[in-house]
């Protein structure tokens, strides 16, 4: 709840102190990417508890096919969307690998239970659609000279509002590093 309030304030919604210069139009896209990254913990817990592999090339291909199809329907470059989601998947997978390593080194920190993987995947699929919608909405910004400063402001706002630790902050930076073209 606090993160939502902070993000709304950072985006200039409902706050008299925000100006057009304060808000980045990329906050909704970056926040969707951040929420998608945050699925790494429950997904890692599910895979850790079940003995499943972190990397799932078949699932990754399904995701890429779905988002590039959505890109085509939005009349935006599917190659661009492919690159964005490849980075997002790699960042999320890296967080999962980090969690596995932490739990291997400290078994007491390992989760004693985990949500069903299908629940996390439904959330991921919804966030994927949101991200493609936001990419389409922000296409002109993503391909303009103001993209980098807008992205930097959005990254700072979202990472702060979500209380990201260094692992998640670096993962978010990686997930978004190809946004500006």
Swiss-Prot record:
Q: In which pathway does it act?
A: Metabolic intermediate biosynthesis; prephenate biosynthesis; prephenate from chorismate: step 1/1
| InterPro entries, sorted | Chorismate_II_sf, Chorismate_mutase-related, Chorismate_mutase_periplasmic, CM_dom_sf, CM_II_prokaryot
Q: Which reaction does it catalyse?
A: chorismate = prephenate
Q: Which cysteines are joined by disulfide bonds?
A: 147-180
Q: Where does it live in the cell? A: Secreted
Hey, what's the signal peptide range on this chain? 1-20
Kindly give the Gene3D superfamilies that the UniProt entry links to this protein: Chorismate mutase (1.20.59.10)
What do we know about how this protein assembles, alone or with others? Homodimer.
Residue span(s) of domain Chorismate mutase: 21-100
Q: What is the name of the protein in this document?
A: Secreted chorismate mutase
Q: Which GO terms describe its molecular function?
A: chorismate mutase activity
């Amino acid at each position: 709840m606090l993160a939502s309030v902070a993000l709304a304030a950072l985006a200039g919604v409902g706050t008299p102190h925000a100006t057009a210069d304060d808000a980045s139009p990329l906050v909704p896209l970056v926040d969707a990417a951040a929420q998608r990254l945050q699925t790494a913990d429950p997904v890692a817990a599910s895979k850790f508890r079940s003995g499943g592999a972190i990397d799932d090339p078949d699932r990754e291909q399904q995701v890429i096919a779905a988002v590039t199809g959505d890109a085509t329907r939005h009349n935006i470059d599917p190659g661009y969307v492919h690159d964005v989601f490849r980075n997002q998947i790699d960042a999320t997978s890296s967080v999962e690998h980090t969690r596995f390593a932490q739990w291997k080194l400290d078994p007491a920190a390992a989760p004693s239970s985990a949500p069903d993987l299908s629940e996390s995947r439904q959330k991921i699929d919804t966030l994927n659609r949101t991200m493609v919608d936001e990419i389409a909405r922000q296409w002109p910004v993503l391909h303009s000279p103001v993209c980098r400063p807008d992205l930097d402001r959005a990254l700072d706002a979202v990472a702060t509002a979500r209380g990201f630790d260094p692992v998640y902050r670096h993962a978010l930076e990686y997930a978004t590093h190809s946004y500006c073209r």
